[in-house]
């Protein structure tokens, strides 16, 4: 029986398809892993598919090796003629473009012999929403900062929207972010980063080399909210707030609005009905805020918007329905890669001994309370990061959105 070459267009006497591997970096991002899966699916035929392995586990004679470089949007694909292919890209978004191009060349589960392919991927902006705190022992937060900083560095978002960014994160994580080239968005009229109460748990950071900050602001949610004629708690020690920023691309000059928020949770002082009513109030305030920002300047009238955070409610909830009156869930907009993964379980199990969340299975689709919505832009990818670092450092998973401004 003839053995078939996975990459060559003709039958050869080399190796069985199942002996072929797609090799990804040991610290591959979620988009890199998804791209490898897309290529493996395209190369699958007759129930056989190439294995996806990390560099240290590569053993096959035929490989497609994926390498991420220095953050640029270029990519290059080369083949050695013996069934091996190398994909080198500046970042995971460029790698995705190379994989999509390769998938277009696959016929009958095989990739024909190719000459070198290179190009520039479309310039995607990446926005990450990430609740970094997680409940548990406060003293353990500094131990988790390095893992979270590495996770953020791997994803390399252009805009980072963090929730529950408390004093310990400000002391430990903010210097790491600044060292990596991020600047924080001011939220007060005098250019400060903290509200008068001394907190700003919903901070926005951005890459100043890629984006210019035009305007920004923010405010905590009210301490008390009226529900059915009675005032109930509307905040938790000033930890629930909103920050916003208008950015202009340094290349291209297009502008957009990024909004980061954290809606009220189901505090013990509230009934389920009351907590829902407070979150509906939060959502209505967001709709008013977006309209008010667009009214600041005629140039902002049709401003593209990305809005999200920890909304403490499901996708089909009343608060999300309010947001959907003006914005669309990015899950519905993503046209290339997407998932609907929330945090794992009702809450991750926190281990007081280690100060981390117990390593568990990769979360399933649905069940999330972190949501992202948008308008006036194109969404390529919407993915939750389910890597090991993400699963041990918070009870929420980072959500990344890759977008193009229209």
Enumerate the predicted regions with their spans.
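Active-site-proximal beta-strand elements of phosphoester/diester hydrolases
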Residues: 86, 124-137, 215-219, 255-265
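N-terminal, active-site-proximal structural segment of metallo-dependent hydrolase catalytic domains
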Residues: 117-179, 189, 193-200, 406
